[in-house]
């Protein structure tokens, strides 16, 4: 991926349970009618218009791509990409040589604020 200009963020946004009802992959017939969460559309489209990169990163499988794209279009989401196949249920631990930032969704989209947090890191022997 390209180097982003200063100030531009690359947002990876989950779908189920984050921007709409939490629908398991085993119930795809419910996906097209998933209820949109308040402020999700407004906030994400605002970030898009501000020049940030919006990538939906979902645990839905490739079999669900078409219904997911239709749902996003139906609701008017602006985005750059859609990645399928994220590990389910938070069952992942990201390891990277670059800083990774995460924001837990707590039921409402708002502007982001800064907070100090305790994190786990590899022991590099430089305590």
Spans of model-derived segments:
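HAD-like aspartate-dependent phosphatase fold
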Residues: 1-127
């Amino acid at each position: 991926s390209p180097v982003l200009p200063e100030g531009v963020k690359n947002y990876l946004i989950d779908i189920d349970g984050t921007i709409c009802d939490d629908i398991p992959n085993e119930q795809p017939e419910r996906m097209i009618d998933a209820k949109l969460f308040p402020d999700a559309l407004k906030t994400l489209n605002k970030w898009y218009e501000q020049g940030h990169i919006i990538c939906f990163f979902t645990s839905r499988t490739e079999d669900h791509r078409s219904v997911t794209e239709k749902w996003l279009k139906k609701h008017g989401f602006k985005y750059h990409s859609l990645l399928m196949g994220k590990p389910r249920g938070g069952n992942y631990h990201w390891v990277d040589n670059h800083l990774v930032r995460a924001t837990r969704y707590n039921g409402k989209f708002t502007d982001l604020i800064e907070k100090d947090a305790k994190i786990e890191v590899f022991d590099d022997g430089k305590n």
